């Protein structure tokens, strides 16, 4: 059984290498644009589609769909959901378990349900490499 699922596939566009881990779902009822260097952790759901709010319209099968853009070098943490109409800015990190229902600017760490900016990513976040000689 495949560990990746999508609605159509032809609406998913990658700009370069992107790593999509196992158990990810992309509901591509509108275009999903994924930048280069993107890391998508296990269990992420990228959902362009939604349902009507009013129950009478849902009963008629009326739904919604909005495109999603994930810019270059984004990391989306495990079991997060990205909702339709959202853009995640270049270099940003989405914390595990987040629900992204609004745009996220570039170069930030954002977490939560709903997802909110925690802080900017700075040079202090660079991994310190030590060499033992």
Please state what every model-predicted region is.
Residues 87-89, 104:
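Extended beta-solenoid/beta-helix repeat architectures
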Residues 105-106, 111-114:
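Acidic, glycine-centered active-site loop in nucleotide-sugar glycosyltransferases
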Residues 2-87, 113-115, 119-131:
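Flexible, glycine/small-residue-enriched loop-and-beta-strand segment within the central core
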């Amino acid at each position: 059984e495949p560990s990746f699922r999508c609605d159509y596939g032809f609406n998913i566009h990658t700009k370069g290498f992107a790593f999509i881990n196992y158990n990810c779902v992309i509901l591509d009822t509108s275009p999903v644009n994924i930048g280069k260097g993107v890391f998508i952790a296990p269990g992420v759901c990228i959902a362009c589609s939604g349902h009507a709010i009013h129950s009478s319209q849902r009963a008629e099968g009326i739904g919604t769909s909005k495109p999603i853009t994930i810019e270059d070098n984004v990391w989306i943490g495990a079991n997060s959901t990205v909702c339709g109409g959202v853009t995640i800015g270049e270099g940003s990190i989405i914390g595990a378990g987040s629900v992204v229902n609004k745009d996220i600017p570039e170069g930030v760490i954002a977490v939560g349900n709903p997802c909110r900016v925690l802080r900017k990513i700075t040079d202090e976040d660079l991994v310190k490499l030590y060499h033992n000689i």
